[in-house]
Amino acid sequence: MAADEELSGVWQARVVTLFPDAFPGVLGLSLTGKALQDGRWQLHTHDLRSFGVGKHRNVDDTPAGGGAGMVMRADVVGPAIEAAQRFARGRWPILYMSPRGRPFTQKMAKDLARCDGVTVLCGRFEGVDERVLEHFGVTEVSIGDYVLTGGEIAAQTVLDATVRLLPGVLGNAESTVEESHSNGLLEHPQYTRPAIWEGHAIPEVLMSGNHAEIAKWRAAQSHRLTQSRRPDLWAAKGAKE
């Protein structure tokens, strides 16, 4: 979407990337895609290549001090971020998708959804010149303890988790209340028809119509799953209480 097509007051994502064609990607599908079409949020990309230097629009160079790979240049990434930030207003953080960043969490998604927008920098190669991150006060964010070939997939993950929390994006707002991580715990198991499949029956309590017992069962299952699969979350939950 072009900059002159902005809708006033709508939550925006501005993505600085070498591969603008990667967007909207999955963000253009399902609920996030419908919300994008309906103008509930906006997505703009800024092509790093257009800020490249020299005849070949170079965006990277060899690491200072030696080493493998290439590093994205400050005099390329810097102007690209400045171009994106010209449209920033109010609370508008700049994120850099990086395996050394802060772990992305549901709480972070909620915080981003309360902002007016976000600029996301997608790295490539060995990363970005550190001076850019320091100059713009960029927050480094990681979606897990592994390395991707670039930040585009990670950026879409962060944006998907955030956009679905914006008002009016989800058909049922209660979905965000009961799902995993909404209260620091993993979500309870879900079932639907048929009542019996391949010899496996839906737990009787869920078919009982007793809402108090159903709520009790779901809470117990949520606790059980969190304890067994995410002891770190369980410990953090206990510490808060």
Swiss-Prot record:
Protein's recorded name: tRNA (guanine-N(1)-)-methyltransferase
PANTHER family (UniProt xref): TRNA (GUANINE-N(1)-)-METHYLTRANSFERASE
GO terms assigned for molecular function: tRNA (guanine(37)-N1)-methyltransferase activity
Classification lineage: Bacteria, Pseudomonadati, Pseudomonadota, Alphaproteobacteria, Rhodobacterales
EC numbers for this chain: 2.1.1.228
InterPro entries: Alpha/beta_knot_MTases, tRNA_m1G_MeTrfase_C_sf, tRNA_m1G_MeTrfase_TrmD, tRNA_m1G_MTases_N, tRNA_MeTrfase_TRMD/TRM10
The protein's assembly and partners: Homodimer.
Annotated keywords: Cytoplasm, Methyltransferase, S-adenosyl-L-methionine, Transferase, tRNA processing
One Pfam short name: tRNA_m1G_MT
Gene: trmD
Function field: Specifically methylates guanosine-37 in various tRNAs.
Localization annotation: Cytoplasm
KW Magnesium (keyword) present: no
Main localization (coarse): cytoplasm
Class of this enzyme: transferase
Annotated residues for binding of S-adenosyl-L-methionine: G123, I143, G144, D145, Y146, V147, L148
GO cellular component terms given for this protein: cytosol
Cytoplasm is among the record's keywords: yes
Similarity comment: Belongs to the RNA methyltransferase TrmD family.
Any single biological process term in GO: tRNA N1-guanine methylation
Catalytic reaction(s) noted: guanosine(37) in tRNA + S-adenosyl-L-methionine = N(1)-methylguanosine(37) in tRNA + S-adenosyl-L-homocysteine + H(+)
